[in-house]
Amino acid sequence: MPNTVVIIDDHPSFRASARAILEAEGFEVVGEAADGSSGIAAARMLAPDVILLDVQLPDMDGFAVCRELNLNGGPPAVVLVSSRDAADYGGLIEQSGARGFIPKDELGGTTLADLLE
């Protein structure tokens, strides 16, 4: 199972709660970023297995970040998160190249692991 994670989200409280949830369930959070450009830099520098990526960021949306990260193919697996429902984004999730989508209120290590299998 992929183990290392970078969390990209502009809300410090969500980053802290996501870190606590994932680390309690065996994931290792190796980095965090508060916007898309910092997230791309962190992902390239830290080379995590998984990126937990908020759809709504201050400088660019998560779909653009995902496309940028997927340019080289291969890892990391990108999982989009949002406080909104997946249906609100239409086909953008599928078009982004992300491994999947998890509503923020459903985030858990098991949910993430199931999506990565």
Kindly label every feature range from the protein language model.
Residues P58:
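The feature encodes the CheY-like receiver
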Residues D35-S38, D61-A64:
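Acidic catalytic/metal-coordinating carboxylates
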Residues P12-G31:
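Two-component/phosphorelay signaling modules centered on CheY-like receiver
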Residues F63-G74:
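Short amphipathic alpha-helix used as the core "switch/output" element in two-component signaling
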Residues I8-D9, A33, I51:
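Conserved sequence signature across two-component system core domains
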Residues A64, R84-I102, E106, T110, ...:
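Alpha4 helix (beta4-alpha4-beta5 surface) of REC/receiver domains from two-component response regulators
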